[in-house]
């Protein structure tokens, strides 16, 4: 390393190899493992475990993803109803235990999934006596009712009941006053004269929380593990909610990447990754780069294992037959390989590649 003066009075540090702007992100540890775990229906409630992350990144990413999931994902909701023989929400219904205000409140909690972005009109026709739930609506073409056990109303004997339920897609929370004003102005031409607007909560995510735990790579334990707990209404799965939120953030942050130099470095990296190797470039790294104990390193060296590509093709039985190599060393190697999404017993076609030494240097430098 040397110290240089650029002529303007400022002093900079010069290193042996040229610094690339892509080093800002390439030199950071990226998550190598994302697991979806939970009890019961993973399409509605699950935990996503992401590791390893650089220290502090779990808090940064967890906060950003939680905020986007709770505020910016689009979903589906009821925005209005029409009940046969009813002109406004203060009307009482003969033979129905609930009044119209109760119906509006109950139906505002109806959760559906539309297969298109167009609004739809669902129909509910029932005859008493008995409790009427969302199951009476049934699934229509292009729409699925998700909470069919939702209580809607209770009918008396021989009471005929008919209503329309208006659903559409949207984002966040829209108060009934907005849809009421839209219907009066004629902006919502599909509704009838007896339209009664409801408050619409579109967010498909019911609850998000995250916690931060310690993670490790080899002997180093100063990494983060991010555990995100997500509960949805069933119109989107928890892992999809996280993925979409990440895509929203990616799209918004893209505007900040205005530097041509940054764009150029990103493009070169993508081009290289797209055209390079038929297998994980980690296989080209030497086992000397792994954070292993001295005993494990010596065992690999004595067994003439130079590259990670050589190592992963060994089975656990092969490794345990190596002199002085025990179960503790095996667990250590399994853990390090798992952090790179690799494992023992892999089959690597066409290994080793030609000019492996040059390829190894190239990817080590990058």
From Swiss-Prot:
EC category name: transferase
Region (Alpha C-terminal domain (alpha-CTD)): 274-366
GO BP of this protein: DNA-templated transcription
GO MF term list: DNA binding; DNA-directed RNA polymerase activity; protein dimerization activity
Family: Belongs to the RNA polymerase alpha chain family.
Signal peptide: none
NCBIfam families, per database record: PRK05182.1-2 (NF003513), PRK05182.2-5 (NF003519), rpoA (TIGR02027)
SUPFAM superfamilies in the cross-refs: C-terminal domain of RNA polymerase alpha subunit, Insert subdomain of RNA polymerase alpha subunit, RBP11-like subunits of RNA polymerase
Annotated protein name in UniProt: DNA-directed RNA polymerase subunit alpha
Function according to Swiss-Prot or TrEMBL: DNA-dependent RNA polymerase catalyzes the transcription of DNA into RNA using the four ribonucleoside triphosphates as substrates.
Organism: Anaplasma marginale (strain St. Maries)
Enzyme Commission numbers on file: 2.7.7.6
InterPro entries, alphabetized: DNA-dir_RNA_pol_insert (IPR011262), DNA-dir_RNA_pol_RpoA/D/Rpb3 (IPR011263), DNA-dir_RpoA (IPR011773), RBP11-like (IPR036603), RNAP_asu_C (IPR011260), RNApol_insert_sf (IPR036643)
Region (Alpha N-terminal domain (alpha-NTD)): 1-260
Gene3D superfamilies: 5' to 3' exonuclease, C-terminal subdomain, DNA-directed RNA polymerase, insert domain, RNA polymerase, RBP11-like subunit
Assembly: Homodimer. The RNAP catalytic core consists of 2 alpha, 1 beta, 1 beta' and 1 omega subunit. When a sigma factor is associated with the core the holoenzyme is formed, which can initiate transcription.
Swiss-Prot/TrEMBL catalytic activity: RNA(n) + a ribonucleoside 5'-triphosphate = RNA(n+1) + diphosphate
Keyword RNA-binding recorded: no
Pfam family, one: RNA_pol_A_CTD
Any single GO CC term annotated in Swiss-Prot or TrEMBL for this entry: DNA-directed RNA polymerase complex
Keyword field: DNA-directed RNA polymerase, Nucleotidyltransferase, Transcription, Transferase
Record's comment describing the protein's domains: The N-terminal domain is essential for RNAP assembly and basal transcription, whereas the C-terminal domain is involved in interaction with transcriptional regulators and with upstream promoter elements.
